[in-house]
């Protein structure tokens, strides 16, 4: 599962990984973004170049409003880079994730939320999102630290600081 598709860059990596997988389980990629994304070429490639085809489904809604019951091996999170969003995403998606949670931009937005870096209006975002302003101003690092403290079944597997940062959490209870 990928949430925060935008320009579909990471979606291609997810699709290639599934196409190369030797697993005998059905191959399934779920894509999500709050805005509609152009994935037509990716859908065509998933049908034509993979045998059996990778099943790709998508929903263009706020990921916190998704109604998902089936688990995923991995979730890639690249959405709104603020404490409040990631805290809620981890609470929602960790129970649905069998192996890995991967998060992007965890270095560039580690201490301060992307709202500050991008010069957005935090007061307006607090009103539109319903998140407290301090959860918008704070970065991703605190959400990850709190999650790991509260969930001993998850560990920090990798933390890359180049290219804006990539953090990998691994489930260790099964």
Language-model features: where?
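S-adenosylmethionine/decaboxylated-SAM
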Residues: 1-174
């Amino acid at each position: 599962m990928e949430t925060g598709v935008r320009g579909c860059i990471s979606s291609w990596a997810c699709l290639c990984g599934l196409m190369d997988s030797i697993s005998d389980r059905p191959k399934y990629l779920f894509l999500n973004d709050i805005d509609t994304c152009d994935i037509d070429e990716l859908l065509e490639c998933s049908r034509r170049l993979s045998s059996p085809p990778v099943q790709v489904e998508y929903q263009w809604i706020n990921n916190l409003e998704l109604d998902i019951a089936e688990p995923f091996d991995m979730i890639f999170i690249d959405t709104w880079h603020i404490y409040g969003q990631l805290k809620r995403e981890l609470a929602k998606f960790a129970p649905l994730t069998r192996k890995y949670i991967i998060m992007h931009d965890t270095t560039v937005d580690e201490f301060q939320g992307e709202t500050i870096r991008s010069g957005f209006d935090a007061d307006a975002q607090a009103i539109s999102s319903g998140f407290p302003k301090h959860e918008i101003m704070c970065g991703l690092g605190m959400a990850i630290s709190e999650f790991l403290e509260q969930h001993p079944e998850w560990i920090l597997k990798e933390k890359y600081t180049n290219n804006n940062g990539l953090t990998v959490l691994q489930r260790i209870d099964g």
